[in-house]
Design a protein with these regions (language model features):
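Dynamic "connector" segments at or just before major functional cores
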Residues: 1-163, 167-189, 194-208, 400, ...
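Conserved nucleotidyltransferase catalytic core and NTase-mimicking acidic/glycine-rich helix/loop elements
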Residues: 4, 370-401
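Acidic/histidine-rich, metal-coordinating catalytic segments
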Residues: 141, 212-222
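Short, surface-exposed basic-aromatic patches at helix termini and helix-loop junctions that form
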Residues: 227-236
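Structural motif
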Residues: 12, 42-51, 302, 351-361
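An anionic, glycine-rich sequence signature occurring as long contiguous blocks
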Residues: 1-4, 236-342, 429-438
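Short amphipathic alpha-helical "interface-anchor" segments enriched in bulky aromatics
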Residues: 70, 320-363, 367-376
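Short, surface-exposed connector motifs at secondary-structure boundaries
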Residues: 206-213, 232-233
């Protein structure tokens, strides 16, 4: 049977979930704050800063970052209504206004602040229970992004061995809400500029939750400055030590004398212990783990024992096993990095300018948190087709199942209705999510 393909006069959309995105953005002051800013080269813009910003967030929530993708929505009546914009900008207008605002107009701080305010109203980051206390994890780390083969400003050799950027992120809670981000040249060391970033991250995190924070950092952030910042801010911390060439055999002997031993398998013994060291005249607890292997997991006997030593600074009074377990959970943030890079398709940033790409990253921070809120709103909803219990829904799942939902926009009798197809099992969850987040 041959089908006749033709254009309909009905208003149909493949991205009905953007209505929920628009509803959440209407809970913020993003539009009014951006519209109050006067750019030097555009004091009276034809398309308001708020419309430009909200339109771009609508793109990012579909997993698109290239400015040219906005052209598909310029005559999209549903996109305009859902996002609450008067005019959808063209691709050149979007690019030019972001270039003009980047790094000098304060847009970056506004995006971070409005994102934090939205999380404070709509999110409750999950804590971890440690010694009878609830601590909200604050995980900070760098995630190299591959931009090989480009001549973008700031692209340089990363520690992963390719050319790209080295953005740093601060994730809050078990769910991984982003409270701070910053785009950095690929060659920059993890610690460069981190003291300022760390202070700001703690401020943003505390604007979201009033509970105690547990900061977790890897060995690239082993610095006395970071420890002092945590102590001054009264934040609990676990920071992996960079042993910097210290003798592993010496630490192994110390662990054998002062630590407790367990043998997880024949040929592998693990010692764990704790000691107190002096840092800038103040005592700081250190956890040490030493591993000695005489055989491999497959049973192969080693000619000489293999020794592996790891250590962590911590403010927690708990036993070494608890501290190490909490630090190992820090690795979950690699999943959050992956979602930003792949699910939001952000690794290859759209501009050739470092400042503009950093502004794009702040837009992505807000878009990511909106999608995360939508994913968290699925829990406890009996109409959601997914039944497997999880702590969070992957961003890709939210985009695929909720954002890309087909529907029909009906304007009749002074009412505007969004109708999804009969039998579409994701329609009721979207309706409930909009009601829950309203």
């Amino acid at each position: 049977m041959r089908l006749v393909i033709e254009e309909s006069k009905e208003i149909l959309t493949t991205h009905a979930g953007l209505y929920a995105v628009g509803e959440l953005l209407r809970k913020t002051k993003l539009r009014s704050r951006l519209n109050a800013i006067r750019l030097a080269g555009r004091p009276e813009p034809e398309i308001s800063h708020g419309d430009v910003a909200v339109s771009y967030i609508g793109l990012l929530c579909q997993g698109k970052n290239d400015f040219d993708h906005i052209e598909a929505h310029r005559e999209d009546d549903f996109f305009r209504r859902a996002m609450g914009v008067r005019v959808v900008p063209s691709s050149p207008t979007l690019r030019q206004q972001l270039d003009e605002a980047a790094g000098q107009a304060g847009w970056e701080a506004i995006l971070r602040e409005e994102s934090a305010h939205l999380l404070a109203r709509k999110a409750r980051p999950t804590a971890v229970t440690v010694g009878g206390r609830d601590l909200v994890p604050l995980d900070i780390d760098v995630s190299p992004w591959d931009n090989s083969g480009t001549k973008k400003e700031g692209v340089s050799r990363t520690y992963h061995g390719y050319d790209g950027y080295a953005p740093i992120f601060a994730f809050l809670g078990v769910e991984g809400f982003v409270v701070h981000s910053e785009l950095r040249p690929g060659k920059d060391h993890s610690q460069k500029g981190t003291t300022k970033f760390l202070r700001e991250s703690i401020i943003y995190a505390r604007s979201v939750t009033g509970r105690l924070l547990l900061l977790r950092l890897d060995a690239g952030f082993d610095s006395r400055d970071n420890i002092l910042i945590c102590r001054d801010a009264r934040v609990e911390f676990i920071i992996k030590r960079n042993l910097r060439g210290e003798s592993e055999s010496v630490w192994l002997e110390w662990a054998k004398r002062h630590g407790s031993m367990r043998e997880p398998r024949p040929g592998k013994r693990v010692w764990r212990g704790a000691l107190v060291c002096d840092v800038e005249g103040k005592p700081v607890r250190m956890i040490v783990e030493a591993v000695e292997r005489t055989t491999r997991a497959n049973g192969q006997v080693l000619l000489l024992p293999e020794v592996e030593v790891q250590a962590w600074w911590t403010s927690l009074p708990d036993d070494p096993d608890t501290v190490i377990r909490l630090y190992q959970e820090h690795g979950t943030m690699e999943q959050f990095h992956s979602e930003i890079k792949t699910d939001l398709d952000l690794e290859r940033l759209p501009s050739g300018k470092l400042a503009t790409n950093n502004l794009v990253l702040q837009f992505a921070l807000l878009a990511y948190n909106i999608l995360r809120l939508m994913g968290q709103a699925m829990f406890g909803d009996p109409t959601v087709p997914l039944r497997k219990a999880r702590q969070r829904r992957r961003i890709r799942t939210v985009i695929k199942d909720l954002i890309y939902l087909a529907a029909r926009l009906v304007v009749h009798a002074r009412q505007v209705r969004l109708r999804y197809g009969q039998g579409n099992r994701w329609g009721p969850p979207l309706r409930r999510i909009c009601e829950a987040l309203a």
